[in-house]
């Protein structure tokens, strides 16, 4: 079994404050990254998108497209050898299917390529219980997550039905937007990664985040987690803090309808243990941080290091991310930040919420049934443990989320 690798684990976690970051513009694509696995991912995505650009878009996907893969082995790689390993393998799963999904989610392949290859992805200090590591594309539009070989197998199991569901809902969903799945091999280290759209905004900073399952047993962030700059808090933290999501009736109705439909689909596939990821942007707090950043930048003026601020690198004028006019505080582009919802007028604070379902690849199999039996013995039959069957899980999940929206 392949386990998640150390994709950039040696790099310090990036700060979450609204502070200007810098990167060295890569005029020629050098795929420069601190981790050779990241360099190979950048190289592979660039190669894949270039190859796909020469393949005619089919009228419809065929059954074989859901089993297909493309792979390349590179030996004695001499070009750009100071940045790239000399021996590596890159494999892309179901390239035609994921290209079709990107299109249905309104993502242009050229923009996707730019986001993942113009500058190295940034390390993210989030870490799943499974040990998965996360990176964010430099422009914060996409999340790169290490997964296991079992996750890859489960993804293949559900991909056909997932694609059909995305077609039927016209890409309007709270489910993860799966955009690409790859295997990377460098110096005998093999990892699998999946790329999804970032739930959070690429420009509005999140000051508080929650992972909610609708369960209360062992659902509190650890002291170690709470010590982080942006900890991932859980159900009991949400309840104990008296937190609420303040959205108007229309937004609440639309959100819950989407959530119900998505969760029913997951229950049909016998999937469970998923969460609602919630990120909260505080408009006034962000404005204050922006003022402080501008004051600090004024003090640092004249200390140029030859680098450019994060955004569109000088050689990529076509990147649509920054081509639109500047937005006012608390405003966002719904075509990019697709999960954003503004608070209602009577909210105690001016906030923007980013909410979507994550971690949907857990199938209710014999292992989960055994875990459920063990936890029932430990906590009692009435306890709200997370390992219940998919139908129970979905009902409890929907009930909990319905109660936190006000």
UniProtKB/Swiss-Prot annotation:
Q: State the UniProt keywords alphabetically.
A: Acetylation, ATP-binding, Cell membrane, Cell projection, Cytoplasm, Kinase, Lipid metabolism, Lysosome, Membrane, Nucleotide-binding, Nucleus, Phosphoprotein, Transferase
Which InterPro entries does the annotation name?
A: PInositol-4-P-4/5-kinase_C_sf, PInositol-4-P-4/5-kinase_core, PInositol-4-P-5-kinase_N, PInositol-4/5-P-5/4-kinase
Q: Which domain of life is it from?
A: Eukaryota
Spell out which residues are annotated as carrying Phosphothreonine.
3
N6-acetyllysine: modified positions: 89, 145
The entry's note on the tissues where this protein occurs is: Expressed ubiquitously, with high levels in the brain. Present in most tissues, except notably skeletal muscle and small intestine.
Subunit info here reads:
Homodimer. Interacts with PIP4K2B; the interaction may regulate localization to the nucleus. Probably interacts with PIP5K1A; the interaction inhibits PIP5K1A kinase activity.
Q: What is this protein called?
A: Phosphatidylinositol 5-phosphate 4-kinase type-2 alpha
Record organism: Homo sapiens (Human)
Gene expressing this chain: PIP4K2A
